Swiss-Prot record:
GO terms for biological process: rRNA base methylation. The active site is at C241 (nucleophile). Belongs to the class I-like SAM-binding methyltransferase superfamily. RsmB/NOP family. The lineage of its organism: Bacteria, Pseudomonadati, Pseudomonadota, Gammaproteobacteria, Alteromonadales. This is Ribosomal RNA small subunit methyltransferase F. It holds the Pfam family Methyltranf_PUA.
Length: 482
């Protein structure tokens, strides 16, 4: 049973729009959330994914504000996170309302090349934006919590997002270190989580207005930092999964009061069919749970109309960046290895070298070298030794899919496996082959045309090369439905 604190109810009763009823709000908070997922278009299309899953009993209801988002229903009670298709990165389990902020930032005419996600983990919005950018440009994903950075990186890797750079900082430093550097910024701010009560019945049990006001002060500092990091003419989206005005409208009003006409609010009333039901007088989206039968959420969009003064002197550039750009000879060698041995044509990105490691960075990252310390940049392609190159798993996941999808295998050694074999592979086991043949060495293991990783073809079996930290204890095969 959902626990709604009486002080919270009293506060919401004063803020709830006149056309909505408190009884409907409480009833909506008491209902379980509908299951929702987002198809990962970096690896598949929504139509192909539906064709794959409908025989397994899935039904799909489109989410109005996300072209590749769906409410789903199916008979299985198992955890979807263990599903083979989820481990492959074909979809992300994402609450419908949380798909709103990237949609608001990436309206049809947006062509953002440098984007900041200020509070990224676990990665739902980061990977949604990576898909909207189609792995072009640069997406800087920041997370303050060290443990959550690991989760963020795992999801970025699983979804094949190759143009991300991960950072681990308090979001309040970005306005200083990366002043007016980004075309667009998303800040899904840490918040009181009032909108999440449908999946966490105790979320509001100890709610207090004092805590709300304390959180809002942090949010004001974060939105100001995000605004300072935004280029003039750029767009900023501020969102929370909470419902009170202090953390939502109040934070946006603070920014406008601080920077005046440099802050121009943009109306989201036409963002999707039905958006007007949740639009505030300022043009923000205040999604109460009963409006769309979803989590409660808040989304605001603004444009930075002009440059504003920085608050701190420009920091000195950091020295000793550990990567150097590959020489023409090095670049040619790694390109030939990927093309000849793997059938993968490397994208026209920056090939970088650190010791014996070869990496692929977005070109846009050049402008950020020395300005801030990054935890992870782009994709690690391969290690080099006297025996030659050894491809890295993340490169196969991020880059092989496009080659296979286009049918451009170019003589690559690819082994397509069954669902049972895919399960065994993801659990770290070797795969016996029905017919013994000539050993082929390193091969790309695929299921349903999408790469799972690498293996060594020994003639009578595939010797598993999946990194140990990616081995699963359980893999769920969703059965066909009668």
């Amino acid at each position: 049973m959902v626990q709604l604190n009486q002080n919270f109810i009293n506060t919401i009763a004063q803020e709830l729009p006149a056309h909505l009823s408190m009884d409907d709000f409480i009833a909506a908070c008491s209902r379980p959330l509908r299951r929702s997922i987002r198809v990962n278009t970096l690896k598949t299309s929504s139509e192909d994914f539906k064709r794959l899953m409908q025989p397994k009993g899935w039904t799909f209801e489109p989410i109005p504000w996300c072209e590749d988002g769906f409410w789903i229903s199916y008979d299985e009670e198992e955890q979807l996170g263990n599903a083979l298709e989820h481990i492959q990165g074909l979809f992300y389990i994402q609450e419908a309302s949380s798909m709103l902020p990237p949609t608001a930032l990436f309206t049809p005419n947006a062509d953002w090349q440098c984007v900041l996600d200020l509070a990224s983990a676990p990665g739902s919005k980061t990977t949604q934006m990576a898909a909207l950018m189609n792995n072009q440009g640069l997406l800087v994903a920041n997370e303050y919590s060290a443990s959550r950075v690991k989760v963020l990186h795992a999801n970025v890797l699983r979804m094949g997002a190759s143009h991300c750079a991960l950072t681990h900082f308090d979001g309040r430093v970005f306005g200083e270190y990366l002043y007016e550097s980004f075309d667009a910024v998303l800040i899904d701010a840490p918040c009181g989580g009032e909108g999440t009560v449908r999946k966490d019945a105790d979320a509001l049990k100890s709610w207090s207005l004092d805590e709300v006001i304390e959180i809002s002060e942090t949010q004001k500092a974060l939105i100001e930092s995000a605004f300072l990091a935004l280029k003039p003419g750029g767009s900023l989206v501020y969102s929370t999964c909470t419902l009170n005005r202090h953390e939502n409208q109040g934070v946006c009003e603070y920014l406008q009061q601080t920077y005046g006409d440099a802050v121009q609010f943009e109306s989201l009333s036409q963002l999707f069919d039905g958006a007007e039901k949740a639009t505030t007088p300022e043009g923000f989206l205040h999604v109460w749970p009963q409006i769309y039968d979803s989590e409660g959420f808040f989304v605001a969009k603004l444009t930075k109309t002009r440059s504003v003064p920085r608050l701190q002197p420009e920091p000195k550039l950091q020295k000793n960046f550990p990567f150097t750009e590959a020489s023409a000879k090095q670049a040619k060698a790694i390109q030939a290895y990927f093309a000849d041995d793997l059938g993968i044509e490397l994208p026209d990105d920056l090939i970088m070298v650190r010791d014996d490691e070869f990496w692929l960075f977005p070109h846009e990252f050049r402008d950020f070298i020395g300005k801030m310390r990054f935890q992870r940049i782009g994709v690690k392609l391969a290690d080099h030794s006297k025996h030659g190159f050894k491809v890295r798993h993340e490169a196969i996941i991020a880059l092989a899919g496009k080659a296979l999808k286009a049918g451009a295998k170019n003589g690559a050694k690819v082994v397509e496996v069954s669902d049972e074999q895919a399960k065994e592979y993801l659990m770290g086991r070797d795969i016996p082959l029905d017919t013994a043949g000539k050993a082929q060495g390193e091969v790309i293991v695929c299921y349903g045309g999408a790469p799972l990783g690498m293996a060594k073809h020994l003639g009578n079996k595939l010797k598993n090369s999946l990194p140990r930290d990616l081995v699963k204890d359980k893999v769920l095969l969703l059965p066909p439905q009668a």
